[in-house]
Swiss-Prot record:
Name assigned to this protein: tRNA pseudouridine synthase A
Keyword Lipid metabolism: no
Organism, as annotated: Wolbachia pipientis subsp. Culex pipiens (strain wPip)
Reaction catalyzed: uridine(38/39/40) in tRNA = pseudouridine(38/39/40) in tRNA
InterPro entries: PsdUridine_synth_cat_dom_sf (IPR020103), PsdUridine_synth_TruA (IPR001406), PsdUridine_synth_TruA_a/b_dom (IPR020097), PsdUridine_synth_TruA_C (IPR020095), TruA/RsuA/RluB/E/F_N (IPR020094)
Record keywords: Isomerase, tRNA processing
Active site: D52
Amino acid sequence: MRYKITIEYNGSSFSGWQKQQHSANSIQETIENAIFNFSGERVSLHCGGRTDTGVHALGQVAHFNMERQFELYRIRNGINYHLKAIPIVVLSAEAVDDAFHARFSAKKRYYEYRIINRYAPAALEIGYVWQVFNPLDVNIMREAARHLLGKHNLSSFRSKDCQATNPVRTIDDIDIVQNGSHIYIKISAISFLHNQVRIIVGTLVEFGKNRTNPQEMLNILSQCKRNAAGITAPPHGLYLVKIDY
């Protein structure tokens, strides 16, 4: 039987989603152990979006197969019981067709990056936002972001460790919302390159901080080199919001 679970987690204390050979601190392995403790079965968990160290999730999706059948509320509650005191929670569980795959069946992924833009230090949101002290021109950031919409070679916006053979991606939407000192950068696409969202955010922040001409984003795109773009924004401001299927 194949099950789909939707998961929320605080990524601060984990080594990222993916199970590591020399680390027992991945989100994947933590949940797999909770499933074993609940059901007595060893499973392999497959996620819809592999998050890096320190990245959070509001709506991560994963699937796994089990021999035994359980009522869905028992799966959710049973896993959560064995995750108590750990900042991971299963929000829901569903039975799905064997053809469903959390990664390959996804139609769109939604990320949100959270910034607090003020000089006074953040007290309540440490570890959940990126604090940028210099004033940001959000209108310039919006204009620069418009040039990233659509299908592009995004080599300038992927890490040197990115293993994707094709750097072309299509960004469906970039929305930048300002609410007082908080800035939310929301990006959606069917798939992303490694560190793509964080490099885009770091680049947009440099545009907003330096009042760079938004047209310069076209030059960054055309160079197709990582050093043409801005810094990689820190992981703790990034959230995987949801995945559409």
